[in-house]
Amino acid sequence: MKVAVVGATGMVGEIMLKVLAERNFPVTELIPVASEKSVGKEIEWNGKSYKVVGLQTAVEMRPDIALFSAGGETSLEWAPKFAEVGTTVIDNSSAWRMDPSKKLVVPEINATSLTKEDKIIANPNCSTIQMVLTLAPLHAKYKIKRVVVSTYQSITGTGVKAVQQLENEYNGVKGEMAYPYPIHRNAIPQCDVFEENGYTKEEMKLVRETQKILNDKTIAVTATAIRIPVVGGHSEAVNVQFENDYELNDIRQILHNTSGITLQDNLDTKTYPMPIYAEGKDDVFVGRLRRDESQPNTINMWIVADNLRKGAATNTIQIAEYLVTNKLV
């Protein structure tokens, strides 16, 4: 399988290369792709050295699969060019997610909808993935009426500049700012730009993408997204109201049996999800399950995942694995 990684020198791109190796993805030829300033650089992967190429060169090489993590503008311009030569593109940006003609895929939930005709496939937002993976089996059983989510998001979701800003501030060094305010010892209630309704793009991604992935626009979702000085992963406080009542132990059993979820919910041993322990892992961790005593049929939970892995790179490669296994590429 000829695989191009677009944005190979970026934070998510580097993790994608790592995950491809870890999961023994059937790569016969690797094509690392990056911006012009990185073209010609060499990267090591699986014991071999590869030269970084530009986008046009990569298109001409006609890869079977192109894994994109290079921003929305690059995806909008170049994903169709790859698709035209027969490449299947799996894109990490928000560029194609809400396009009605494109699938928005979390493999454990809706990979079976994919066909050979799907040449541009959208990977959901990191904070959406961990939430919908948890919600999907519960929606199937109890039907979700409303979701209230507050996110506590890792600076790695912003990128290398944000990590550098935190390190600079921690060490008392002046440097380039990824955020409009200090992030060290702070919480910034703005992830991405504001939309006309007063919500950020990140908050509205949680609303729109959840409805699309779960294929149910009747689910009411409201979100608040906060950036915090953490690197291990995103955390979410999620309040879910069902149409039907539930038993807490049944919810635990459903989540325990759901592929990709690790239940960490033992108050006696103070066991619950935390980003410092989610870092570097592919599962979504769920805990602090408790009945909402303020209204019926409602549960509170705490969801944590490594936003660079299941929230980005791993989910992308799981989609690619599904395509290969089912001979869709």
Which stretches of residues belong to each language-model region?
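N-terminal Rossmann-like NAD(P) cofactor-binding subdomain of oxidoreductases
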Residues: 1-183, 218-220, 284-285, 289-295, ...
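Charged docking surfaces used in two-component/phosphorelay signaling
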Residues: 66, 155-329
